[in-house]
């Protein structure tokens, strides 16, 4: 278990995936915020700055790429690490966005948790507690 001071924002338009990821992260001790599209994620981040964003790539209203662009344009958000999730071939996404980490849906739970932990460990925002 990790301290509940680390907050992960999970963004996915598929309710079942959103709830499953939120439950899994809570079981691991993370504080979890959820959003069903990018615009809702930005609204959540206006209230609480997460230590990590885990976002689906293809969503209605505001998709993953547009969400990431908005995060990078905002000085108060740009240092938050973002992990992308997609049902499409993530190798192509990795070539387009080499600085980002991506998970292929369906993903291995252990691989997901290792990537979340590694991203949080590398983030000074999360380490400040």
What is the predicted role of each segment?
Residues 59:
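Receiver (REC) domain active-site loop signature in two-component systems and cognate sites
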């Amino acid at each position: 278990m990790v301290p509940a001071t680390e907050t992960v924002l999970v963004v996915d338009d598929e309710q079942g995936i959103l709830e499953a990821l939120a439950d899994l992260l809570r079981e691991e001790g993370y504080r979890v915020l959820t959003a069903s599209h990018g615009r809702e994620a930005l609204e959540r981040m206006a209230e609480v700055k997460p230590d990590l964003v885990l976002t689906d790539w293809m969503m209605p209203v505001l998709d993953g790429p547009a969400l990431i662009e908005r995060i990078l344009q905002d000085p108060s958000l740009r240092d938050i690490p973002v992990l992308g999730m997609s049902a499409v071939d993530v190798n192509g996404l990795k070539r387009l966005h080499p600085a980002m980490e991506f998970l292929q849906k369906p993903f291995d739970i252990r691989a997901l948790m290792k990537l979340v932990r590694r991203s949080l460990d590398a983030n000074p925002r999360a380490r400040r507690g």
